[in-house]
């Protein structure tokens, strides 16, 4: 029956969406846990934790789960210890990707990331195999609707950041700074403009490859999506952009 089939499809889609949401929550809690263990368990005095909590709230992670994760990390409650690892790989068409991982099993993570690259016409490389194509910087991003660009720019000059630019396609203001200055710059922008949409160390491509061919876009999108669907992968950075499309942070 058509009605039954449609209902089954709806249930399937809802199940897939729920699974994605659950996975996203797990990754957010993992980042909160690591951030709280690395510094003070108070977001006001731990910028990485503050950013993690802000991201969790944007995703509607329940407040009690955020607080429990912080308390468990602060109290050293028995649990899994996570290791931060960065993998470098080559994607199709000369693209380069850096995969950021938080894992409790290094061997499993490496095996799964390698398998995904090989399935999607790419290859996992050695440390340093693609990172030379990027600049390692501090990255701070604000929504254009939330702050005044001239004020942001002036503050950036005072702090001697590398760049403050407008991304009109995505409606964002993007600040980059030296890695050694990141903590100071992040705190200064937070004090004046509030919590940014994103604040983290980032690998920014020296030369951006713009891709407009739909088949190439589909193949690269499939690679990035499968990597980010992996439980251990927090996010992926690359040296490419899709022409005319807005990329998520």
UniProtKB/Swiss-Prot annotation:
Which keywords fit this entry according to its UniProt record?
A: Cytoplasm, DNA-binding, Transcription, Transcription regulation
GO-annotated molecular function: DNA binding
Does Cytoplasm show up as a keyword for this record? yes
GO-annotated cellular components: cytoplasm
Compartment list: Cytoplasm
One Pfam family this chain carries? Transcrip_reg
- Work out whether the entry's keyword set contains Transcription regulation: yes
Q: Name one GO biological process term.
A: regulation of DNA-templated transcription
Subcellular location, principal:
cytoplasm
What Gene3D superfamilies does the record tag this protein with? 1.10.10.200, 3.30.70.980
User: Cross-referenced SUPFAM superfamilies, in alphabetical order?
Assistant: YebC-like (SSF75625)
The cross-references to HAMAP family, in alphabetical order and at most eight, read: Transcrip_reg_TACO1 (MF_00693)
Which protein family is named in the record? Belongs to the TACO1 family.
Which PANTHER family does the record cross-reference, listed alphabetically? PTHR12532:SF11, TRANSLATIONAL ACTIVATOR OF CYTOCHROME C OXIDASE 1
Q: What is this protein called?
A: Probable transcriptional regulatory protein Wbm0670
Its source organism is: Wolbachia sp. subsp. Brugia malayi (strain TRS)
């Amino acid at each position: 029956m058509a009605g039954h089939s449609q209902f089954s499809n709806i249930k399937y889609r809802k199940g897939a969406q729920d699974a994605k949401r659950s996975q996203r929550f797990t990754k957010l809690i993992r980042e909160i846990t690591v951030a709280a263990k690395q510094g003070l368990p108070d977001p006001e005095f731990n910028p990485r934790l503050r950013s993690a909590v802000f991201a969790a709230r944007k995703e509607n992670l329940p407040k009690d789960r955020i607080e429990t994760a912080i308390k468990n990390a602060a109290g050293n409650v028995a649990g899994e210890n996570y290791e931060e690892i960065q993998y470098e790989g080559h994607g199709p068409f000369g693209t380069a990707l850096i995969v950021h991982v938080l894992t409790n099993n290094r061997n499993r993570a490496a095996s799964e990331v390698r398998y995904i690259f090989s399935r999607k016409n790419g290859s996992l490389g050695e440390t340093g195999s693609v990172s030379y194509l990027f600049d390692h910087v501090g990255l701070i991003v604000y929504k254009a609707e939330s702050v005044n660009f001239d004020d942001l720019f002036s503050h950036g000059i005072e702090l001697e950041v590398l760049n403050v630019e407008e991304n009109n396609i995505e409606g964002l203001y993007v600040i980059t700074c030296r890695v050694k200055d990141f903590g100071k710059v992040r705190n200064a922008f937070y004090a004046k403009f509030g919590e940014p949409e994103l604040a983290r160390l980032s690998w920014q491509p020296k030369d951006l490859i713009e891709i407009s061919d739909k088949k190439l876009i589909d193949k690269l999108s499939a690679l990035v999506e499968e990597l980010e669907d992996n439980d251990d992968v927090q996010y992926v950075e690359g040296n490419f952009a899709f022409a005319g499309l807005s990329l998520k942070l």
